[in-house]
Amino acid sequence: MPISKIHARSVYDSRGNPTVEVDVVTETGLHRAIVPSGASTGLHEVVELRDGDKTKWGGKGVLNAVKNVNDVIGPALIKENIDVKDQAKVDEFLNKLDGTPNKGKLGANAILGVSLAVAKAAAAEKGVPLYAHISDLAGTKKPFVLPVPFQNVLNGGSHAGGRLAFQEFMIVPDTAPTFSEGLRQGAEVYQELKALAKKKYGQSAGNVGDEGGVAPDIQTAEEALDLITEAIEQAGYTGQIKIAMDVASSEFYKEDAKKYDLDFKNPESDPTKWLTYEQLADLYKSLAAKYPIVSIEDPFAEDDWEAWSYFYKTSDFQIVGDDLTVTNPLRIKKAIELKSCNALLLKVNQIGTLTESIQAAKDSYADGWGVMVSHRSGETEDVTIADIAVGLRAGQIKTGAPARSERLAKLNQILRIEEELGANAVYAGEKFRTAVNL
């Protein structure tokens, strides 16, 4: 079925920054996708095209990316007349049209919007939900797997004030019998945590960060973990709900010294207290011994390969590469060869097309890795990643706290999918790392 119209516009993300929305029109109607954007972005990600005109939106406008869709990509793709169901061919065409290795000419934000909207058009043409179409594209088996929602309930690092260096503390309801029960448990713990934070740190501690987590003025990881442990206990889920962290350590790596500064938000930080990667690894291990930590993301800086391999050899929980791998096939291949981590954080806007995202997941699965599908800190009401998580059988999704509509949009979409699939779906639960084999 041919595409009759492709139109892009500039809309706003959850941080009030412009982002790209794309409409693809076929005989089945209008199919729309909105592209997200990240706050802490990896060096090796594809290029998110921003206008750089400081007189508008502080230079963050996306009018050039929008223009590239409307004037270049749209007309060319319509003329090419590729079947929307042939996602690989569509994405290959988009990449060739751009012609750069990092999508820097047309912008990954322009290309991704088109890629995702085309997938929605294809699902409509087949008369199936988006997750089922993605499952077909990826060749995943049945039954469908509903992911464990990793809920970012406490924020630090670049996402919050306070001195806390680690960026995200997540609760992981992996012993719940179903997705909806897991989400309920998470929501209940979140409410307890919010009340506790206000009681201990004052009313403003209930204020939420970019991803819906609370951001009290916490100094250390232990303090954060104690607070979360107490909230889990008060909600009645001790021993049932686990914890995951996204350290985002590239943000506090001192490259010249090859050390990590846990006091990086303090301009007067004391260099004698900076940690070597071995010391930081020991800190993680001591935390994992004391708290029910099942997953650590970006424990080391994105190019500190030696540290990753050292840590991988000596720990048994999930080690997730985000800044390390940036959903990039070459970086994933290197991480597999160097035995750096054992799970991929999949962000579609780091690689820029649906086909390449599916391939990144397949490459990771092939080496026995887990795959966690992820939102970005600048999100929208678009719920495509919920369908991607289910379609790929990823078994884990990270999409913020059970707060703020742009986060809940994804979680609510999975609730709908759960209801629709009924007995034809299983909850990944404690097998979230190997859900693709369920």
Curated annotation (Swiss-Prot):
Residues noted as binding substrate in the record, renumbered to the chain: 159, 168, 297, 322, 374-377, 398
InterPro entries linked: Enolase (IPR000941), Enolase-like_C_sf (IPR036849), Enolase-like_N (IPR029017), Enolase_C (IPR020810), Enolase_CS (IPR020809), Enolase_N (IPR020811)
Cofactor(s) it depends on: Mg(2+)
Subcellular location per the Swiss-Prot or TrEMBL entry: Cytoplasm
Keyword set, alphabetical order: Cytoplasm, Glycolysis, Lyase, Magnesium, Metal-binding
EC numbers on record: 4.2.1.11
Assembly mode: Homodimer.
Full protein name: Enolase
Species per Swiss-Prot/TrEMBL record: Penicillium chrysogenum (Penicillium notatum)
Name of the coding gene: enoA
